[in-house]
Regions:
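Anion-binding and metal-coordination hotspots
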Residues: 1-291
């Protein structure tokens, strides 16, 4: 989960068009070889980006929008045996493989979240707070439909159709890795998601209006370094086997005092760090000089 580098783009540029230049720069900067594999979720990808990855000869593992596949592929997916932790492959003519896995844990989570969303919809429907403007594909509003006489209702048919996909997850790859390895590599994206949560949460990173490009670059650099320091502290906590999270360590460290004393006899100075509480003592090893 260590951050290695970053690239800056104009704020008005669509982020879907920033990936290829960023990958090219990253590969060149670190002189990466042919075993370099791009892993990305479906939100960052479009047909143009996938085509550019193929043209550049990159290997990739991408999240698949299995509900948007063609009729024959969707029929194949829904006909698969739903056995926990099983995966199936469908080879495409362009050399890609569509890997579909099933997870009981994911199925239960998706069913639970959908039921909660539908419950909120039904409550809003009964109170008369649903309007035709809410008939869209955002969130659980996708279960709403509007009739010819402009009456909004909840579609039980759409709900039943959505249930069929519970627990199913798709991945697209042009690598030779086996399905289990592909899925494991893709699931590593949770580290990236956690990085964003830490940046916005613990580190409280926020956009700031700057007048010059130099100030923008400095702001991003400071944010990058702050997260890198956070990850290094996390690593040291693990090495020293400290049973505390980074946030709690930081809170405790803020209350530790170091004093500097001048000896009246000879004018020399010595410093001493005061560890006064149990929490202070628990993180004392972090203050020891490196060996």
């Amino acid at each position: 989960g260590y951050p290695l580098s970053y690239s800056l783009f104009n704020g008005s540029q669509y982020e879907g068009f920033t990936m290829i230049p960023m990958i090219d720069d990253f590969k060149q900067r670190f002189t990466l070889g042919a075993d370099f594999v791009v892993v990305a979720d479906s939100g960052l990808m479009n047909k143009n980006n996938v085509a550019l990855l193929q043209e550049a000869g990159y290997k990739y593992i991408l999240g698949a929008r299995i509900k948007n596949e063609g009729a024959s592929v969707k029929q194949w997916i829904l006909s698969l045996e739903k056995k926990d932790k099983t995966s199936y492959e469908h080879k495409r003519q362009n050399g890609e493989r569509l890997i579909v896995s099933y997870s009981e844990k994911r199925a239960k989570k998706e069913a639970y979240n959908r039921n909660r969303g539908i419950a909120r919809l039904r409550k809003a429907y009964k109170s008369g707070h649903i309007t035709k403007q809410q008939v869209n594909k955002r969130g659980y509003n996708k279960f709403l439909e509007i009739s010819k006489d402009i009456e909004v209702s909840i579609s039980e048919e759409k709900i039943a159709e959505d249930c069929k996909w519970d627990g199913l997850k798709g991945y697209i790859t042009n690598t030779d890795l086996d399905a289990e390895r592909v899925i494991a590599q893709y699931h590593g994206l949770w580290v990236v998601e956690r990085a964003f949560r830490i940046s916005k949460g613990t580190l409280e990173m926020r956009p700031i209006f700057h007048f010059t490009e130099r100030r923008i670059e400095a702001h991003i650099c400071i944010c990058f370094i702050a997260y890198k320091v956070y990850k290094e502290l996390e690593r040291l906590i693990g090495i020293n086997k400290i049973d505390m999270g980074v946030d709690h360590v930081l809170d405790a460290a803020k209350t530790i005092t170091t004093i500097r004393i001048k000896m009246p006899e000879n004018g020399t100075y010595f410093t001493k760090t005061l560890f006064l509480t149990e929490k202070h003592l628990a993180i004392k090893s972090l203050f020891d000089p490196p060996k």
